[in-house]
Amino acid sequence: MFPLLGLFGGTFDPIHKGHLALANELIQKLPSLTEIQFIPSRQPPHRPSPLASPANRLEMIKRAIANQPNLILNDVEIKGNDISYTINTLKILRPLFLTHALCFILSTDAFADFKHWHQSSVILEYCHLIVVNRPNYRLPQQPWLSDLLSHHQTENAEDLGRFQFGKIFFQTLSPRPISATQIRHYLAKGDYEIVAPLLPKTVLAYIKAHKLYQQ
């Protein structure tokens, strides 16, 4: 059996308690998943540029995951100078973790757009996909999606450790409708009390100290 290494990509603009809860619950529900690496993107392919700088986003993640040994910061995409394509990241990481099964973590709505990812046809040659539920979201009925799942989906979590790549596993998690977009909206207006329950204290303190996301 291969130990599982979780790869959690995103802008983390800013990282919030929903991100942390997702990672920790995944580790609880998948015992073979002993580590999740947070991989902030420099420039996501299908989204606007993050508002916070790469350096600020890295620092916020460091503060958010401090004292949580199962959660690790990986700056591989921040070090790049181009668009942060998942396939390029996987090609860098695969040789570094030859004894692990890489598990790329994504939401159901991101998975519904998987066909349009850069070199999506070869991504599953490098990793598994762990698709986590998003509140009140159902996958669209698309022929390409049905075909992909018929070849790669497994309902047995142990398959993620039996193979190093090529499986798609759906994991149901507790609903956490926290939106970074909404958080930025309130931060722009200086409504710190509203966002305080949604952000780690150390992250909110950093945002205040550096006046991030202000209009």
Swiss-Prot record:
This is Probable nicotinate-nucleotide adenylyltransferase. It comes from the Bacteria. SUPFAM superfamilies: Nucleotidylyl transferase (SSF52374). Pathway: Cofactor biosynthesis; NAD(+) biosynthesis; deamido-NAD(+) from nicotinate D-ribonucleotide: step 1/1. One of its GO terms (molecular function) is nicotinate-nucleotide adenylyltransferase activity. Pfam families: CTP_transf_like (PF01467). PANTHER family: NICOTINATE-NUCLEOTIDE ADENYLYLTRANSFERASE-RELATED (PTHR39321), PHOSPHOPANTETHEINE ADENYLYLTRANSFERASE (PTHR39321:SF3). It is an enzyme of class 2 (transferase). Its EC number is 2.7.7.18. Catalyzes the reversible adenylation of nicotinate mononucleotide (NaMN) to nicotinic acid adenine dinucleotide (NaAD). It comes from Coxiella burnetii (strain Dugway 5J108-111). The keyword Nucleotide-binding applies.
